[in-house]
Design a protein with these regions (language model features):
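NAD(P)-dependent Rossmann-like dehydrogenase/reductase catalytic/cofactor-binding core
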Residues: 79-127
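C-terminal substrate-binding/catalytic lobe of Rossmann-fold NAD(P)-dependent oxidoreductases
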Residues: 1-95
């Protein structure tokens, strides 16, 4: 909620059977309070702090991957890694999520949710 404009989701395709990058391009002016790139990264980091399967890349890690994110980096895991790329001068940012669509995808989510509903360890049966 709170968006005046509908976000645009994009996916990357390539010659790999497993792994995925999903992107959400943002016009910073369209967000409440017109946050900067670091503010978005800080908000995501605070939200996912302590989450076992979700991590947010630091500015340095994001810079190291600016040329290319490998969709297969998280294969065979239940992990999801978030990156915030952006250009403060143009007021644009891209949120990128890196995941194994076969692990963190629907089957992994089903196991994780079942564990939570049954009061089991969230990671039971997951890689």
């Amino acid at each position: 909620g709170g968006f005046d404009h509908t976000p645009l989701f994009t996916a990357n395709v390539g010659r790999f059977h497993q792994g995925m990058i999903v992107e959400v391009p943002l016009q910073l002016w369209s967000l409440p309070g017109t946050p900067g790139i670091e503010a978005i990264r800080d908000t995501l980091s605070a939200r996912y702090e302590g989450c076992r399967f979700v991590s947010v890349a630091t500015a340095e890690e994001t810079s190291d991957h600016a040329a290319m994110l490998d969709p297969e980096d998280l294969n065979d895991t239940n992990n999801l890694r978030l990156y915030v790329f952006g250009n403060a001068e143009t007021g644009q940012a891209v949120l990128a999520a890196q995941l194994d669509n076969l692990g963190k995808g629907a089957s992994g989510a089903a196991v994780q949710n079942m564990n939570l509903m049954l009061g089991l360890d969230e990671a039971a049966g997951l890689v």
